[in-house]
Amino acid sequence: MWILAHVIIAPNSMYLQTRVHGSAGRKMDAAFATLPSDDTVRDKTLVVLQAPNDFTSYYFTLMRSGDALPLPEHTRVLSTGLHPMTIERPGANRLVLRTTDGFIAQRDLSIYRNHKYPMQTGETISITGMTAVVTKADIHGWPMDAVFTFDKSLDDESILWYIGTMAPERNPKTGRKLKVERYFPVPVPAVGETLSIDDLLARSEKYKMAVAAAEAPG
């Protein structure tokens, strides 16, 4: 039994885990390659309005650091999951985000908040350069709507606005069209505007180029 477990099963299991983790790592590398990586980001704040999953901020920082690549001075992921969300800009430095399913995608596995620590309407979180106030929470204490106030105008060049989504892309080897995690720069809404995630992506030149490339004949 010891030989079966340690000589036969364990090495094969380790090989399988390495392949799985390697594949996942390559996918994340490709996704994070669409986030800014030149030296100019070192004094910038990267704001991801929505990321496809809860692990973006953690793995992005970990992988960039491991590869000795430039990191933004601050990274703020405001919501995760591919859920409908509206973004209202009532003032120069303020956003109101409203969701249908909350700000956290994988609630059971979330690295952001444990379900044992529910949030309340009116709860305030302040971090460098930004304050978030929960304006609506569900019965389980998960935030649904929130106001984000920054310490400078949202139009300031030091703030980089991005959205993560599952974008269409053709496999370069097979020509097959896939949905892959990618990040796109988006213009921040104008004061007085209320837009959806799809509205903002539709204003992104890079997103439009990616969609057009995926739709082009192979």
Mark where each language-model region is:
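Luminal/periplasmic acceptor-recognition loop/helix of membrane-associated glycosyltransferases
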Residues: G66-N114
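Short coil-to-beta-strand transition motifs
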Residues: E123-V133
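Short, solvent-exposed secondary-structure boundary/capping segments
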Residues: D138-D151
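Short, solvent-exposed mixed-charge patches
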Residues: A216-G218
